Design a protein with these regions (language model features):
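Divalent metal-dependent phosphate-bond-processing catalytic cores, especially two-metal-ion Mg2+/Mn2+ enzymes
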Residues: 2-45, 63-68, 79-106, 118, ...
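N-terminal glycine-rich anion-binding loops that anchor highly charged ligand groups
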Residues: 45-56
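N-terminal low-complexity or amphipathic/hydrophobic leaders
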Residues: 56-76
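Active-site alpha-helix of zinc metalloproteases
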Residues: 111-115
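Catalytic acidic motif of RecA-like/P-loop NTPases
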Residues: 122
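Post-HEXXH active-site segment of zinc metalloproteases
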Residues: 127-140
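An acidic, phosphate/nucleotide-engaging active-site surface
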Residues: 158-161, 167-170
Length: 281
């Protein structure tokens, strides 16, 4: 699922102050009349500390030469996660908020939104073990951000389930819920053209960057054999590594593993030449 807004180039961003960059960090998603989700997103967008964490997460990714981890990445994951959850619900797959707590789909939407919004805030501190850092940052802010949305004990239930989605998105994470699986898979789907190829265009020619540059488009549709069908269009078969090493790994072992079908194919008759040569130093 492509995003209309792309990350701001580093040289362009450097012309602005940190305050200006943080001020523009506002996320949007189709709430479909979910007033709880509306209130939660409004609270997050109004929270300068959260938006500063997004700014600092991107700073860390730039220092390491990684793909975009700014608020744009957050917005992509937010929208993808909501789409996945709604497609699963349409097929009769109930989230934990419904099956375990007797709540509603709209509450599950708040949980996956929270997971998407906070899953990488720990990157503002350090890349290594950032999921754990995200946990303690989110644990401090979530209750306050949810204060106008839920009363106790619902507020703590929503916050706890959100924290489960955050820790579950790490590479060897074990999400116990549909919501956790949704956030984990959504995080791997920010790979459309202009997104994961950033390290490649920066001169990094390893297999991760090369395979990322091979991904042109990602489509998330209602499936026929399974509730969700993810179609990935590639310009080069090197993209298979990105699909299998990143996406398939994120999907395996989650409660939605058997609910999602992944199909990747190279478009056209010929493959795009991604680099002229490769030299091992």
């Amino acid at each position: 699922m492509p995003c209309e807004d792309g990350p701001v180039a580093k040289d362009e961003r450097s012309k602005r102050s940190a305050a200006e960059a943080i001020a523009e960090a506002k996320v949007h998603a189709p709430t479909r009349g979910n007033k709880k989700l509306d209130k939660f997103l409004e609270a997050v967008n109004d929270d300068e500390q959260v938006r500063t964490w997004w700014y600092m997460a991107q700073m860390t990714s730039e220092r390491l030469g990684m793909s975009d981890h700014s608020w744009v990445h957050v917005q992509v994951i937010l929208n993808v996660a909501l789409r996945l959850l709604r497609l699963l619900d349409k097929a009769g797959v109930e989230p934990a908020m419904v099956t375990d707590h007797g709540m509603k789909l709209r509450d599950a939407e708040v949980v996956v939104a929270g997971g998407a919004l906070f899953h990488d805030v720990g990157m503002s501190i350090h890349r290594k073990d950032h999921e754990e850092f995200s946990l303690f940052l989110a644990a401090d802010r979530l209750p306050e951000l949810l204060a106008d949305v839920y009363k106790e004990p619902s507020r703590t239930i929503v916050a706890s389930e959100t924290l489960n989605t955050i820790i579950g998105h790490r590479r060897r994470g074990e999400p116990y819920t549909v919501e956790g699986g949704v956030v984990r898979v959504a995080d791997a789907l920010d790979m459309a053209q202009g997104r994961s190829r950033i390290p490649f265009e920066g001169g990094q020619y390893g297999i991760h960057a090369l395979s990322a540059a091979a991904i042109d488009e990602v489509r998330i549709e209602q499936g026929e054999e399974r509730p969700v069908r993810i179609e990935i269009e590639m310009n080069n078969s090197a993209g298979v590594f990105q699909v299998d090493d990143l996406l398939a790994t994120k999907l395996r072992g989650t409660p939605i593993e058997d609910k999602v079908e992944i199909v990747a194919q190279v478009k056209g008759e010929t493959e795009k030449r991604l680099l002229p040569s490769f030299r091992v130093e």
